[in-house]
């Protein structure tokens, strides 16, 4: 094709006229030093606290210390390729992670990137990891139950949707097991679960994923993993990333449950970053703002009202409340709940489930200490039938523990004390539950009803759990309609109670305790 000179000049003129002029204005700085993932930068006069910075090699960092003549930043990931003299650019953005239903069923890192080998996640939306928690006016009181499927928790320390309930205990006391049971129990309830693993071994996280897949719970779960081998910065931001993913569901009028496993390791990662940034250390060498680290995270778990959901969705969702329930986990050292981080988180949350090593080793699992475990707001959210039948459980256990201590010294006990001890022993036995064997509201109510009616008084303590399991199987087979009615209404009617009394009578008559 021949072009004459005048056509060439016309083409060039047209190109020049249509050129999109857009000079990029970005503040640049220079790396002064790199040590342990902390970068000191000269320049960047306009940088903001928490702003994302771009390093060479498509690496990003967070500006954390804004000083007179330098900026202290933490690198998100590998930093070996960054060296003195490298150029750093401000991005003008704060850190965002992908959010939405596309993440459900996937395992992602602290930045929301998939690490499960199942291909990319094509999320339509992203959200900043740091957000201000809903205000008082936007909230609604906690009044709907978040069933864990564990008898001891749902009867003594109930959790409501939008609550923050701390799970606290030494290592190897079953903290993660309680949280996983709560996640598995949400199957079919329409609750999206987020499990945030901070500072754990990659093998432990792989085991959690396998267990959730086995029990069909990965279909409603997102896993955010920041393993022990990853940078402290990623362990520090992982809970905030998980929270942003949960907030998406809360803000569209759905219910979500988030487990932070565990916040002790996040505090340690934050302490490491702060000390490397040369921030002044305080108690236990933690920085002064370690309380704020957890309070700004846990305050984002809330139940928001219909008006707020309508406002956040632009009127697309009407008449629905949304909730984000948090189960933070804290690991104690030798049962010391008065240490710095445990006391902080206890004061932030709406109650705690305290797990004890002695109970765990004695075979009482979940190893819940009924005396100091409380739920400050969950009582209002408890299912009617469980509230009615489970009221005496905590009292029976507390009295049993007290009397058992005295009974060691006293040889001759009166009849009333002996009865109380026997009752407490049976209740303690019945509160035991194997992992991954969660119960529905009706099945739980059945056990509590039988305890209240004194049906276990002539059952040997060692046989109580076997008797309970067989009676449940019998009712499931012959009176499934009663269980369905209790699950649907959340209450036990007088007629259904008569049916259960007859069922118990006939079952006991044909039951052999040998």
Curated annotation (Swiss-Prot):
Family the UniProt entry places it in: Belongs to the ATPase alpha/beta chains family.
Membrane topology of the entry: Peripheral membrane protein
Keywords of the record: ATP synthesis, ATP-binding, Cell inner membrane, Cell membrane, CF(1), Hydrogen ion transport, Ion transport, Membrane, Nucleotide-binding, Translocase, Transport
The organism of origin for this protein: Chromobacterium violaceum (strain ATCC 12472 / DSM 30191 / JCM 1249 / CCUG 213 / NBRC 12614 / NCIMB 9131 / NCTC 9757 / MK)
Main location: membrane
Any one annotated GO CC term: plasma membrane
Assembly and binders: F-type ATPases have 2 components, CF(1) - the catalytic core - and CF(0) - the membrane proton channel. CF(1) has five subunits: alpha(3), beta(3), gamma(1), delta(1), epsilon(1). CF(0) has three main subunits: a(1), b(2) and c(9-12). The alpha and beta chains form an alternating ring which encloses part of the gamma chain. CF(1) is attached to CF(0) by a central stalk formed by the gamma and epsilon chains, while a peripheral stalk is formed by the delta and b chains.
Keyword Thylakoid: no
Broadest EC class assigned to this enzyme: translocase
EC number: 7.1.2.2
Residues with site note (Required for activity): 373
Function comment: Produces ATP from ADP in the presence of a proton gradient across the membrane. The alpha chain is a regulatory subunit.
Residue positions binding ATP: 169-176
Protein name: ATP synthase subunit alpha
UniProt catalytic activity: ATP + H2O + 4 H(+)(in) = ADP + phosphate + 5 H(+)(out)
Pfam families noted in UniProt: ATP-synt_ab, ATP-synt_ab_C, ATP-synt_ab_N
Alphabetized HAMAP family for the sequence: ATP_synth_alpha_bact (MF_01346)
GO MF assignments: ADP binding; ATP binding; proton-transporting ATP synthase activity, rotational mechanism
Source taxon at top rank: Bacteria
Location relative to the cell: Cell inner membrane
């Amino acid at each position: 094709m021949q072009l004459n000179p005048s056509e060439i000049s016309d083409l060039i003129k047209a190109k020049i006229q249509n050129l999109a002029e857009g000079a990029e204005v970005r503040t640049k700085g220079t790396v002064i030093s790199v040590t342990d993932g902390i970068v000191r930068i000269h320049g960047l006069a306009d940088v903001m606290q928490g702003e994302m910075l771009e390093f060479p090699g498509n690496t990003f960092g967070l500006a954390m210390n804004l000083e007179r003549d330098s900026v202290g930043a933490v690198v998100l990931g590998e930093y070996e390729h960054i060296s003195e003299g490298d150029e750093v650019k401000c991005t003008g953005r704060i850190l965002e992670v992908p959010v939405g239903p596309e993440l459900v069923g996937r395992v992602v890192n602290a930045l929301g990137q998939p690490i499960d080998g199942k291909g990319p996640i094509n999320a339509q939306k992203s959200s900043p990891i740091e957000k201000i928690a809903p205000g008082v006016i936007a909230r609604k009181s906690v009044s709907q139950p978040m069933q864990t499927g564990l008898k001891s928790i749902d009867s003594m320390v109930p959790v409501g949707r939008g609550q923050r309930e701390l799970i606290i205990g030494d290592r190897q006391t079953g903290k993660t097991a309680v949280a996983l049971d709560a996640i598995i129990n949400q199957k079919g309830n329409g609750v999206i679960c987020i499990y945030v693993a901070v500072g754990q071994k990659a093998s432990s996280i792989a085991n959690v994923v396998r267990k959730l897949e086995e029990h069909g719970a990965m279909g409603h779960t997102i896993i955010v993993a920041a393993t022990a081998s990853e940078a402290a910065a990623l362990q520090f931001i992982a809970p905030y990333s998980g929270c942003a993913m949960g907030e998406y569901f809360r803000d569209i009028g759905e219910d979500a449950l988030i487990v932070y496993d565990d916040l002790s390791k996040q505090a340690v990662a934050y302490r490491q970053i702060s000390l490397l940034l040369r921030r002044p250390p305080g108690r236990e060498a933690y920085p002064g703002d370690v309380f704020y680290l957890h309070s700004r995270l846990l305050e984002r778990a809330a139940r928001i009202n219909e008006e707020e959901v309508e406002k956040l969705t632009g009127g697309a969702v009407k008449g629905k409340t949304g909730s984000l329930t948090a189960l933070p986990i804290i690991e104690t050292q030798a049962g010391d709940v008065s240490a710095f981080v445990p006391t902080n988180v206890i004061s932030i949350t709406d109650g705690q489930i305290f797990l004890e090593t002695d109970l765990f080793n004695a075979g009482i699992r979940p190893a819940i200490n009924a005396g100091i475990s409380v739920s400050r707001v969950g009582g209002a959210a408890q299912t009617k039938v469980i509230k009615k039948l489970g009221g005496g459980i905590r009292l029976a256990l507390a009295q049993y523990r007290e009397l058992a201590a005295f009974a060691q010294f006293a040889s001759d006990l009166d009849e009333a004390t002996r009865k109380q001890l026997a009752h407490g022993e049976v209740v303690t036995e019945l509160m035991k539950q194997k992992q991954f064997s969660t119960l529905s509201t009706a099945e739980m109510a059945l056990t509590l009803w039988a305890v209240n009616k004194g049906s276990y008084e002539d059952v040997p303590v060692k046989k109580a759990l076997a008797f309970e399991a067989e009676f449940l199987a019998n009712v499931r087979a012959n009176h499934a309609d009663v269980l369905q009615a209790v699950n649907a209404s959340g209450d036990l009617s007088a007629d259904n109670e008569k049916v259960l009394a007859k069922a118990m009578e006939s079952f006991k008559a044909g039951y052999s305790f040998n």
